């Protein structure tokens, strides 16, 4: 029944505690071959004709990009799929496509001129990093220290 399901959900929610550790933004980047895109503010519609590099399916990052494009009326169909953000950067640096990358990690390659930022009309939402722990179970000393360290960072 629906009532039993609601009770179960509330019990599970009480059992887990979510601690916000921080947030970050992703930016759209490209290699030097795509410098014309960095010269103006682009729309998602305009970018549909360019090859996209993305993380593979079944990642929260990929899910966010699918949702972002869908919310603006466009499908997200990357041309190249990789398993890590480092691989994304390498392919983008070698002009194999454009893609999203964490802003903080893009700072140095941007300064060195290895990549360019493409500014978007449709802003990408911030990403949030959270720690979820089972509040009903005792934590080991090592786990407590790890959590304290993560919260301080």
Placement of each model-derived feature along the sequence:
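Hydrophobic residues within well-ordered alpha-helices
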Residues: 2, 47, 90-96, 131
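Secondary-structure junction motif
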Residues: 36-38, 51-72, 139-143, 147
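Hydrophobic hinge/microswitch elements
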Residues: 66-118
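A late-sequence structural motif
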Residues: 116-153
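Flexible hinge/capping segments at coil-to-helix
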Residues: 13-52, 56-57
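Short, small-residue-biased leader/transition segments that mark boundaries at the very start
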Residues: 1-8
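Short beta-strand->loop
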Residues: 17-27, 112-125
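Short secondary-structure boundary segments
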Residues: 9-11, 32-33, 103-105, 122, ...
């Amino acid at each position: 029944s629906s009532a039993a399901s609601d009770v179960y959900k509330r019990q599970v929610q009480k059992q887990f505690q979510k601690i916000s550790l921080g947030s970050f933004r992703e930016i759209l980047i490209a290699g030097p071959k795509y410098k014309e895109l960095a010269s103006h503010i682009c729309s998602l519609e305009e970018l549909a004709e360019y090859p996209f590099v993305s993380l593979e399916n079944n990642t929260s990052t990929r899910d966010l990009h699918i949702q972002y494009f869908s919310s603006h009326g466009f499908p997200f169909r990357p041309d190249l799929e990789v398993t890590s953000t480092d691989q994304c950067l390498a392919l983008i640096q070698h002009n194999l496509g454009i893609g999203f990358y964490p802003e903080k990690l893009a700072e140095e390659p941007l300064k060195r001129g290895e990549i360019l930022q493409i500014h978007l009309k449709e802003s990408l939402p911030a990403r949030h990093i959270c720690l979820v722990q089972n509040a009903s179970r005792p934590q080991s000393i090592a786990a407590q220290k790890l959590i304290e360290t993560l919260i301080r960072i």
